[in-house]
Amino acid sequence: YQGVKSSIERPLDAFDPGAKYHIPGNTPYTRYYLARVLQYQFHEGLCKAMDFQGPLHECSIYGSQIAGDQLRSMLALGQSRPWQDALESIIGTRELSGTAMLNYYAPLKEWLDNKNKDRVCGW
């Protein structure tokens, strides 16, 4: 339970998850979850390749020749190599990790922690 409730009365037969195609279509959602984790790992890896110094959320790979070349090189592998090799070519490891996502959102988490200090959740 997340402590969130509807702003209006809801009938017992309401089925909001059905509005997302993947639910009634029985489409596996794991790929989207993994893609989100990888997105942050790729971003962090490309920022490191550019020698970016600073918080991850301030790094932009837009217009970077270095980041573009590295990403292009990884994508050129296609299916010729295991996906772990492609991952390693960008981030330097073959492991999936949520650390890059945590690093990206660290300033927001710190702000939220400070903002909510001494607050008690009602649920």
Language-model segments: residues:
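C-terminal, non-catalytic "cap/extension" segments appended to globular domains
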Residues: 1-123
